[in-house]
Amino acid sequence: MFCYQCQETAAGTGCKLAGVCGKKPEVANAQDLLIYLLKGIGLLATLNNSCSAGCTERPKVHHFVNDALFSTITNANFDVESIYARIDTALALRDRMLAKTHERGIDVPDLDVLSWQGTRAVYAEKATQIGILSEPDEDIRSLKELITYGLKGMAAYLEHAARLNHINPDINEYILQTLAELLLCRDAAKLTALALETGTWGVKAMALLDSANTVSYTHLRAHETGA
């Protein structure tokens, strides 16, 4: 495992044997594999972007991707079976999207993330091949992870807002497009710009959740208690 997404990470450089938070290696590795597959789903969604407004499955893609990203944030989910279940779903969703993409005559790049097939028996092995450190360039790796953590935070806001029936498809589409960029882009300048753009969209996600809470529960104000 290798995880450095929180400020408590071992020695300030990264957890390699187990998470300071209590996350075990098999969970960290499973989360890496899930994120890897989400990038493939993001790419397929982007290739089919002309379908974004009318495809009946698009909202399901948005919901799954947000839920999956949310499940990998710090201290959110240490259940490897739960992450494996999401990997199962990601593979099935990817294959359906891939079939639709081929049906539409859209060219699909020859990438492992779009073709790899595996069962739970090999998830752990595959995860060690595509983790954070599989990117050899430290600068590119750092930028991509910074953006990834931004997407995870956005997904958390969006999931909470969706529970209150507040959904912004534009933000969901941004997440899909950015996942695709994380898969394909290795230009530091472009990734730096993308990190800044992700921050802008993160503020929009925060505003959506704030609106959802305000509409549902009214503005926060002090109350007297009987204590």
Predicted regions and their residues:
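Often metal-dependent polyanion-binding catalytic scaffolds in large enzymes
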Residues: M1-S216
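Conserved small/polar residues in nucleotide/adenosyl-binding loops
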Residues: T218-T225
